[in-house]
């Protein structure tokens, strides 16, 4: 039987203001937790509309989560950070692991998220069915989805039938 958190108001669920943050924070609020969004100043207007976000830490860049002011505020609010892909996109694994704030899950596993070959290895070891990896544009033999390095949020992908359509 799962252990229940007795005093949910004692904890704050925090995440970065990115494509999945609204789902994370809405779910946390629905479950009775306080919520905190680490938000880029340029996007604050978007997130201020949502009444399930209790608090915000404004940053110029998401990498500031590793800075003392941000960590201090997260710890003062008794936050548990829910890491998302955006964190991996903005910071090295070493920097993420150095953050002295509780994370949901294991910070070390984010190395696998950041490294395409490690991620593929993890999926293979778990015996997950995955698409065939084509290592070179010269090896494209049929319609393929090409993912550029750093592709995120549905951007950075395209279709190619062969080397010629890849180069277009």
Language model features with spans:
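Short internal beta-strands
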Residues: 33-42
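Short hydrophobic segments within beta-strands
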Residues: 14-16, 38, 151
